[in-house]
Regions:
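Soluble acyl-CoA-dependent acyltransferase catalytic core bearing the H(X)4D motif
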Residues: 1-275, 279-310, 314-328
Length: 328
C-alpha cells in the first residue's frame, strides 16, 4: 500500500477517544475455510493470466483504433500526443549510470533506523510564508540536511538523485477506489548545495510539478507489467542509482487511541527502494514525525546523518527539532 492507504488502514485499528465507539459496526464473521491444493492454485494462476492477456489485447486494440481515428480526424494533435508520451517514457524509464553521492555509494541487505520529530505548525508556516506547500518545505529540509552530511565528509554534492512518490489520487483513471497503491515513483536529480532555503523550496516545488506533469507517470501499471522483459541486472542498477527516497504523508490531526492508550508518536520506517537512505515524514496530532532508514553499507554513521537532518529541518523551519532518541 502507499502512504495514504496505509494511514487509512491504520485508522481502522484505532479509536478517536479512550473509550470504544459504541456505534462501530460489528466485524463480519470470517469466511468458511476451504482446502486448496496445487491444482486449484495452478488453475487460479492460469485464469488470472488469461484475464490479464485478454485485458491487454482489448486495451491494445482499443488504443490502436483510437490512434487510427485520431490520425484521420486530428492528425497533428494525435501524433503530437504520441510523440510526447514516447519521449516521456524515455525520460521516466531511463537507467542512470549510478548514484550521484560520492559518500553513499554502497548497497547491502541490512538496515538501521533513526527518528525525530518537528512541530508541524513550524513546517507549515515555513511553507505558507513563501506561498508553497508542506512537501516543498520537507524536501528543502532534506536537501539542507544531506548537504550538511556530505560537507561533514569533506565533499560537496551539488545534486543528489531522489525517488519521490507522486500521488495519482484524484487524477483521471484514479485507482484508489480499487487498489491500495495509487502512486508512481519519479526519480530525478535534486540540487542540495549552494542554494538558500527559499531557492531549495522553489526548486523542490518546480521539480515535483514538472515530473507530476510527465505523461508516463500515469503509465506506471502498464510499464510495470512489461518490466519482466527487462534483465534483472538492469532493474537492480536502476534501483541502486538513487541516493535518497523521500515521502511525505499527511496523517490524522487528532490523537488516536488503541485499547484505551493514547498513541504518542507515528514514526514511518520505510524501505529505501534501492536508495542509500529513505527519509519519510508522517504528520500526526500537531507533530511531523520523521523516520530515517539507512542501508548499512551506504551509511556507516547513521547518528551523524540524523543529526545533520535535524539541523536541516531546524534551518528551514526556524523551530526547535525534537531529540533523535525521544522514545528510545
Amino acid at each position: 500500500a502507499d502512504g495514504q492507504a496505509t494511514v487509512a488502514m491504520g485508522l481502522a485499528l484505532f479509536e478517536f477517544g479512550p473509550e470504544p465507539d459504541p456505534g462501530e459496526a460489528t466485524p463480519p464473521d470470517p469466511p468458511d475455510a476451504e482446502d486448496v491444493g496445487r491444482r486449484d492454485v495452478t488453475y487460479a494462476n492460469l485464469a488470472d493470466s488469461l484475464r490479464f492477456g485478454a485485458d491487454v489485447a482489448v486495451s491494445t486494440v482499443r488504443g490502436a483504433l483510437d490512434f487510427a481515428r485520431g490520425t484521420i480526424t486530428e492528425t497533428r494533435s494525435t501524433w503530437g500526443r504520441a510523440l510526447s508520451t514516447l519521449t516521456s517514457i524515455g525520460r521516466v524509464a531511463a537507467v542512470p549510470e549510478g548514484p550521484l553521492s560520492p559518500v553513499l555509494i554502497g548497497r547491502g541487505t541490512t538496515y538501521r533506523f533513526g527518528a525525530f520529530d518537528v512541530p508541524f505548525e513550524a513546517i507549515r508556516g515555513a511553507a505558507k510564508e513563501r506561498g508553497l506547500s508542506v512537501n516543498d518545505a520537507f524536501m528543502a529540509s532534506v536537501a539542507t540536511g544531506m548537504d550538511a552530511y556530505h560537507r561533514r565528509h569533506g565533499v560537496v554534492a551539488e545534486e543528489l538523485r531522489v525517488n519521490v512518490p507522486i500521488s495519482l489520487r484524484g487524477d483521471a483513471g484514479d485507482r484508489s477506489g480499487r487498489a491500495s497503491n495509487s502512486v508512481s515513483i519519479a526519480r530525478f536529480p535534486m540540487p542540495v548545495a549552494g542554494l538558500s532555503t527559499d531557492e531549495l523550496m522553489a526548486q523542490a516545488h518546480d521539480l515535483v510539478a514538472k515530473w507530476k506533469a510527465e505523461p508516463a507517470i500515469r503509465l506506471a501499471d502498464p510499464l510495470a507489467e512489461v518490466s519482466w522483459l527487462v534483465p534483472v541486472p538492469m532493474l537492480a542498477q536502476a534501483a541502486r542509482a538513487s541516493d535518497v527516497t523521500t515521502s511525505n504523508v499527511p496523517g490524522p490531526p487528532v490523537p488516536l487511541y488503541l485499547a484505551g492508550a493514547r498513541m504518542v508518536a507515528a514514526y514511518p520506517l520505510v524501505a529505501t527502494i534501492g536508495a542509500a537512505v529513505n527519509i519519510s515524514m508522517v504528520t500526526y496530532d500537531g507533530s511531523a514525525f520523521v523516520g530515517v532508514s539507512s542501508d548499512d553499507r551506504a551509511c556507516t554513521d547513521l547518528d551523524d546523518l540524523v543529526e545533520d537532518l535535524r539541523s536541516g529541518f531546524a534551518t528551514v523551519t526556524g523551530a526547535a527539532v525534537g531529540p533523535a532518541d525521544r522514545f528510545a
